[in-house]
């Protein structure tokens, strides 16, 4: 909800972020991150981050580089099928959706 698009956020003029709270994950937590770009340092054409923490019952996927706010998916059934449905509504073309799904699959493999 904070990131509203590329280089945009929900802060109003004159507002400043005072703190960021990052909840502690359990020792069982696993994560993965994958970014698709042509060369190092380049902005992503597709990216996905995955957090799986069975002890805290957390399964979260974030898909970025979609041209708008990142797509955040939570729940036990989060995976490529759920992401594909969300990406259909993102406005990305078929190639963009396929790159995002490839990034998600690779991030999920890292988190396994």
Regions found by a protein language model. Name each.
Residues 1-112:
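C-terminal structural segment of proteins
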């Amino acid at each position: 909800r904070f990131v509203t698009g590329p280089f945009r956020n929900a802060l109003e003029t004159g507002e400043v972020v005072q703190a960021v709270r990052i909840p502690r994950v359990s020792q069982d937590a696993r994560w993965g991150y994958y970014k698709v770009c042509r060369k190092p340092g380049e902005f992503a054409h597709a990216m996905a981050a995955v957090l799986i923490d069975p002890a805290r019952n957390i399964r979260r996927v974030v898909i970025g580089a979609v041209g708008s706010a990142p797509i955040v998916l939570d729940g036990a059934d989060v995976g490529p099928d759920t992401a594909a449905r969300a990406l259909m509504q993102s406005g990305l073309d078929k190639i963009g959706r396929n790159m995002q799904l490839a990034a998600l699959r690779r991030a999920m493999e890292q988190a396994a």
